[in-house]
Amino acid sequence: MTNHTIYVFAYVAQFGYNTSRHKDVANPHTRVEGSASILALIELNHLTKTFKGKTQTVDALKDINLQIEQGDIFGIIGMSGAGKSTLVRCINFLERPTSGSVVIDGKDLASLTPKELRQLRQQVSMIFQHFNLLSQRDVRGNIAFAMEIAGMKRPQIEKRIDELLEIVGLTDRQHNYPSQLSGGQQQRVSIARAL
C-alpha cells in the first residue's frame, strides 16, 4: 500500500482559514501552534492503527498527535486510502487504536465503560462522506432521528429542528425527501443532524 498523507486543516470559529494551524498529521514532530493541552477538547496522542492481514501489515495511522480546541472547525482531506475514515473512527472509538490515546473533554476513551462511551458519543458528531439519510423520512424526519433515539420530548425536537433548519438554510425544503435534494442540500441536512 502506498503511504499517503492526511492533512488536517483548522478553521477559526469565524470560518477564516488560519494557515498557522495547517498541520501534516503524518509528521509526529509537528504540533499545532497556539494549542495548549489544557484547552484541548479533543486530543490525540501518538495514535496508531495497524491492520494485520494474512500476508501484510498496514499502518493506517502512525504516531498522530493533534489537539482540537473549543471553537475549532476541522476538515480532514487526503487521497483515497490515506486513513481519513480510520482516523475519524478512532476519534470516537468506533475503531480502537492499536496504540496511543484519544482524550475528549479530559476523558481518555480507553478508560470508559461501554455505557460511558455511548454517552460521550452523543456529544461528538461527525459528518461522513456518505450522508446516510433515511430515504423514507423527509428533511425534518432525518434531523429528528438522533433526537428521537436520545429520548428528547417531541416539543423540544420540533423547536430544535426549526432552529437547525434556519442555521443550514433549508426551511423551504423541510418537507422534501432526500431524493428531492441536491448533494449540497443533503450535506446540509447531515450537518443539521450532527448539530
Task: Locate each region found by the language model.
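ABC-family P-loop ATPase nucleotide-binding domain
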Residues: 2-50
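ABC family nucleotide-binding domain
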Residues: 39-195
